[in-house]
Amino acid sequence: MLTRKQQELLLFIHERMKESGVPPSFDEMKDALDLASKSGIHRLITALEERGFIRRLPNRARALEVIKLPEAYSPSIQPRRGFSPSVIEGSLGKPQPVATPAPAKSVADNGNSVSVPVMGRIAAGVPISAIQNNTHDIVVPADMLGSGEHYALEVKGDSMIDAGIFDGDTVIIRNGSTASPGDIVVALVDDEEATLKRFRRKGASIALEAANPAYETRIFGPDRVKVQGKLVGLIRRYH
């Protein structure tokens, strides 16, 4: 799944190459997506490359190759300059912060179990968009939760495996906007991408740290990261 900005950039590159045979410059991509700096374009290109949508050609300036497009892409819809995407894969639109869930509800007479809404998926790997629909509810032990509002997310990726969090697990999150160093959090980056990582501080910056040596720690300015909740529990199904 691509975020809206990733889709916008992919389609902009594709349409420009169809028109002129040459990929757009980083400045052109920045202006087309209305981003403040070229660093945002670098991040989007890296994400598209990691997902297999584009390839950077070595030893050539501005050399990008579009490998594939979103399945629902319609070539009859042409982008305009400045440009909104013709396709939103999965019809997500622009991702928003994780919606505030309803309080957990008791589902047993003795109050030992509660129902928690599953709000979608969260990346433990390359950041993806958190899906904003309450897809279904799950029942968890009441003593797993404590106080506060909670929601669940299904994990996609392997960047937190050394913390015991695996692809396909369901994590239970206590809703909140603050975290202490070392907490595993749902972090929203640039109001665009959601990811599950360990929260650290590096001076005035925020570090989102993976629990897998294959992934680098990502450093952001404090205004670029919003904490959406902290990990309080995990559910795993064995097949």
Swiss-Prot record:
Represses a number of genes involved in the response to DNA damage (SOS response), including recA and lexA. In the presence of single-stranded DNA, RecA interacts with LexA causing an autocatalytic cleavage which disrupts the DNA-binding part of LexA, leading to derepression of the SOS regulon and eventually DNA repair. Residues 26-46 bind DNA. Belongs to the peptidase S24 family. The keyword Nucleotide-binding does not apply. This is LexA repressor. It comes from Rhizobium johnstonii (strain DSM 114642 / LMG 32736 / 3841) (Rhizobium leguminosarum bv. viciae). One of its GO terms (molecular function) is DNA binding. One of its GO terms (biological process) is negative regulation of DNA-templated transcription. The active site is at S159, K197. Homodimer. Pfam families: LexA_DNA_bind (PF01726), Peptidase_S24 (PF00717). NCBIfam families: lexA (TIGR00498). The keyword Transcription regulation applies. CDD domains: S24_LexA-like. PANTHER family: LEXA REPRESSOR, LEXA REPRESSOR-RELATED. InterPro entries: LexA, LexA-like, LexA/Signal_pep-like_sf, LexA_DNA-bd_dom, LexA_repressor, Peptidase_S24_LexA, Peptidase_S24_S26A/B/C, WH-like_DNA-bd_sf. It catalyses: Hydrolysis of Ala-|-Gly bond in repressor LexA. Transmembrane segments: none annotated.
